[in-house]
């Protein structure tokens, strides 16, 4: 696989409001293991959409892995105004999404709901698969994007769920 889209729950979805929460270290350890597998299979691009939570933690891990693996990181934002109203600590995270190998904005500003569909279609057409932290038993708006991914038989979808995190937690405590 050449390009992998990263998506998943936000920190709000997960009830994580502090980066020092033990759940963050469990999630990041799981991300590291999964990304290393993808990279060792030849992954060349990791693509983000610029969301907080899972995506941001995956971005941190990916940037660390760039010292040992040869791959590129890109962020494709929906709008140039993405995150402009975030608080100061989240602005730092937004800046991290912009300090990657490739940054693109699908649209300048929001004009209509159809832009979200066009944006989703664009990122799916320009990636070969996705690594998504999503558990079908804990639905969020991600449900629709995951369904859209699964409709395309040529699109690889790798789901990370709460069971995977439980396994990581148990390994950490052995």
Curated annotation (Swiss-Prot):
Family indicated by similarity: Belongs to the UPF0398 family.
InterPro entries reported in the protein's UniProt record: YspA
Report the superkingdom from the record. Bacteria
Q: Which HAMAP family match?
A: UPF0398
NCBIfam families (alphabetical) = PRK13660.1 (NF010181)
Report the source organism: Lactococcus lactis subsp. lactis (strain IL1403)
Q: Tell me which Pfam families the record gives.
A: YpsA
**Protein name from the UniProt record:** UPF0398 protein YfdB
């Amino acid at each position: 696989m050449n390009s992998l889209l990263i998506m998943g729950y936000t920190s709000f979805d997960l009830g994580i409001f502090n980066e020092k929460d033990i759940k963050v270290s469990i999630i990041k350890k799981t991300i590291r293991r999964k990304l290393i597998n993808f990279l060792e299979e030849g992954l060349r691009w990791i693509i983000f959409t610029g969301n907080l939570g899972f995506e941001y933690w995956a971005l941190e891990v990916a940037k660390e892995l760039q010292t040992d693996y040869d791959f590129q990181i890109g962020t494709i934002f929906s709008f140039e105004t993405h995150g402009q109203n975030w608080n100061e600590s989240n602005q730092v995270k937004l800046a991290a999404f912009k300090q990657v190998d490739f940054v693109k904005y699908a649209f300048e500003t929001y004009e209509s709901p159809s832009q979200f569909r066009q944006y989703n279609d664009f990122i799916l057409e320009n990636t070969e698969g996705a690594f998504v932290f999503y558990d079908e038993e804990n639905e969020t708006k991600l449900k629709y994007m995951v369904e859209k991914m699964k409709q395309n038989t040529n699109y690889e979808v790798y789901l990370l769920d709460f069971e995977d995190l439980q396994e990581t937690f148990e390994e950490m405590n052995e």
